[in-house]
C-alpha cells in the first residue's frame, strides 16, 4: 500500500513540476498577449474547481477508510433491506441526508459496493447524495432569493428521478460492475482486524484513506483540467445560443451543467443568473443533471466502474432527467 501511495505521490510531483515549468518558463511566446490572459484564467478556474472539490474528496476518502476497516459485510447486509423496492427507497433517502458532492461520493460508493452493498443501492446513494442533501437545498433556497419553489422542485423531482434510475439499474445489472474484484476490498478488513487494538485499526483506516485519495485524486485533476478548459475557452453564450424552445434550452442547460462541472453546493447561484432568460424547467435541468453527472465526475466513475456500466448510467440519467422535466413542465 505504501509503495502504491509513494508511486502516486511521485506522479503528482512530476505533474506539478511540469505545470510549474510550463507556467514560469521564459521562453514561451505562443501568441503571448492572448495566451497569457487565457492561461491565467484557465489556471484560476482549475484551482477554484480543485479547492471546491478537495474538501469533499477528503471527507469521502476518510469515510471510505472507516467503512473498509470498521464495517463488516454482515453489518452492511443488515443495513440494506432484502426487499429491493425498500432498498431503493432506503438508499436514496440515506444519500439525501449525506452532505457530499459528486466527487466525494464516488470513493464512498466504491467502498460500499466493494464491501457487498448491492450495485443499485450504491447508485441510489451516488445520485441523491450530491443532489438533494440539506446543504444543497439550502443553497438553492438562498440563491433564488429565498424562494422555496425551485428548492422544493429540485428536491422532489430529483428524488423521483433518482429512484427511477436506481430501479432501472436494479433491473439491468445483477453483477458487480466495479473494475476491482470484491476481494480487493476485503484484504486487511474488519474481519482480520477485529481483535487488533484500536490504534492499529485507526492506522489502517488512515492508510486506506491515503491510498484512496491518491487513487481518486489523479482522476479529479484530469476532470478539473477538462472542466477548466471548457469554462475558459468555450463561451457560455455560444452554448446557450444552441437552445431553441423548451426541449432545446433544457438540453443546453443540462449540457452546460455537465461541462462546467460545478460543485453542487454552488451551482444554484449560477442557475439563478439565468432566471430571467430561460424557463424554470430548463433551470431545473441544470440543477438536477449536474450533480448526478458532470465531466469530472464521469472521469472518476470511469476509473471505478466498467465502461459499459458508466455509459448505460449516463444514458439513463440523461433520458430520465429530460423526460421527467418535460412531463412535469405544466406543473413547474
Describe each model-derived feature in a short phrase.
Residues 21-29, 66-72, 162-188, 208, ...:
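Transmembrane helix exit motif
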Residues 30-99, 103-106, 202-259:
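Membrane-embedded alpha-helical segments and adjacent helix-loop junctions characteristic
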Residues 1-42, 193-217:
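Hydrophobic transmembrane alpha-helices of multi-pass small-molecule transporters
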Residues 7-14, 56, 86-90, 149-157, ...:
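Alpha-helical transmembrane segments of integral membrane proteins
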Residues 55, 59, 72, 102-106, ...:
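Alpha-helical transmembrane segments and their lipid-water interface positions
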Residues 2-7, 87, 146-192, 300-332:
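Juxtamembrane and boundary regions of transmembrane helices in multi-pass small-molecule transporters
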Residues 10-26, 62, 162-165, 318-321, ...:
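Hydrophobic core of alpha-helical transmembrane segments in multi-pass integral membrane proteins
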Residues 97-156, 235-309:
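Membrane-interfacial helix-loop connectors
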Amino acid at each position: 500500500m505504501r509503495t502504491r501511495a509513494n508511486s502516486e505521490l511521485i506522479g503528482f510531483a512530476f505533474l506539478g513540476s511540469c505545470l510549474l515549468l510550463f507556467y514560469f518558463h521564459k521562453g514561451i511566446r505562443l501568441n503571448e498577449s492572448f495566451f497569457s490572459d487565457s492561461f491565467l484564467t484557465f489556471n484560476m478556474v482549475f484551482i477554484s474547481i480543485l479547492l471546491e472539490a478537495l474538501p469533499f474528496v477528503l471527507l469521502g476518502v476518510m469515510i471510505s477508510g472507516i467503512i473498509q476497516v470498521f464495517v463488516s459485510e454482515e453489518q452492511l447486509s443488515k443495513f440494506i433491506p432484502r426487499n429491493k423496492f425498500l432498498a431503493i427507497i432506503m438508499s436514496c433517502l440515506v444519500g439525501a441526508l449525506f452532505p457530499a458532492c459528486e466527487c466525494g461520493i464516488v470513493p464512498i460508493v466504491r467502498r460500499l459496493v466493494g464491501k457487498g452493498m448491492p450495485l443499485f443501492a450504491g447508485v441510489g446513494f451516488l445520485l441523491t447524495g450530491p443532489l438533494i442533501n440539506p446543504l444543497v437545498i439550502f443553497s438553492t433556497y438562498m440563491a433564488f432569493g429565498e424562494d422555496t419553489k425551485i428548492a422544493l422542485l429540485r428536491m422532489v423531482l430529483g428524488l423521483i428521478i433518482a429512484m427511477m434510475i436506481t430501479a432501472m439499474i436494479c433491473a439491468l445489472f445483477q453483477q458487480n460492475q466495479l473494475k476491482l474484484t470484491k476481494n480487493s476490498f476485503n484484504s486487511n478488513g474488519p474481519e482480520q482486524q477485529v481483535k487488533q487494538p484500536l490504534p492499529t485499526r485507526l492506522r489502517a483506516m488512515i492508510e486506506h484513506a491515503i491510498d484512496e485519495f491518491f487513487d481518486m485524486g489523479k482522476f479529479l485533476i484530469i476532470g478539473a483540467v477538462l472542466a477548466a478548459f471548457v469554462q475558459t475557452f468555450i463561451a457560455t453564450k455560444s452554448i446557450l445560443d444552441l437552445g431553441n424552445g423548451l426541449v432545446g434550452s433544457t438540453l443546453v442547460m443540462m449540457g452546460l451543467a455537465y461541462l462546467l462541472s460545478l460543485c453542487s453546493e454552488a451551482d444554484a447561484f449560477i442557475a439563478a443568473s439565468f432566471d430571467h432568460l430561460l424557463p424554470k424547467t430548463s433551470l431545473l435541468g441544470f440543477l438536477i443533471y449536474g450533480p448526478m453527472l458532470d465531466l469530472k465526475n464521469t472521469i472518476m466513475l470511469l476509473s471505478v466502474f466498467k465502461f459499459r456500466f458508466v455509459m448505460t448510467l449516463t444514458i439513463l440519467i440523461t433520458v430520465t432527467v429530460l423526460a421527467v422535466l418535460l412531463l412535469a413542465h405544466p406543473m413547474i
